[in-house]
Amino acid sequence: MARIKRGVVAHARHKKILKQAKGYYGARSRIYRVAHQAVIKAGQYAYRDRRQRKRQFRQLWISRINAAVRQSKMSYSNFIFGLKKASINIDRKILSDIAIFDLLSFNALVKKAKEALL
């Protein structure tokens, strides 16, 4: 039976991990064992934070809409409820952009929401 040498495979695997760990501080970018742990942990953080990013952006949009709506003496929840009653289906991302960049249109939406609540 022939002897199988796997040095090339191991070296390639180590190089791959060290390449992924490039830019890490200290031993995390130089020593395979430490770098491997750092790369795995970075992957876990990335996986978690891809999901958290969606939540955080939704929170940001809601707080922006809330700030804009409160200038018209209305609460965020009443505004959203008024839009639903008025059959205006605009998502929070777009509402947030409208509140920032086009205040006149946003005030028109607030007016429609108020009318729908009466």
Swiss-Prot record:
Keyword rRNA-binding annotated: yes
Pfam families: Ribosomal_L20
Gene Ontology process terms (BP): ribosomal large subunit assembly; translation
Keyword hit for Oxidoreductase: no
Keywords: Ribonucleoprotein, Ribosomal protein, RNA-binding, rRNA-binding
GO molecular function terms listed in the Swiss-Prot or TrEMBL record: rRNA binding; structural constituent of ribosome
GO cellular component terms, A-Z: ribonucleoprotein complex; ribosome
Record-linked InterPro entries: Ribosomal_bL20, RIBOSOMAL_L20_CS, Ribosomal_protein_bL20_C
CDD domains, per database record: Ribosomal_L20
PANTHER family with a match to the protein in the record: 39S RIBOSOMAL PROTEIN L20
Cross-referenced HAMAP family: Ribosomal_bL20 (MF_00382)
Family of this protein: Belongs to the bacterial ribosomal protein bL20 family.
Physiological role: Binds directly to 23S ribosomal RNA and is necessary for the in vitro assembly process of the 50S ribosomal subunit. It is not involved in the protein synthesizing functions of that subunit.
Protein name: Large ribosomal subunit protein bL20
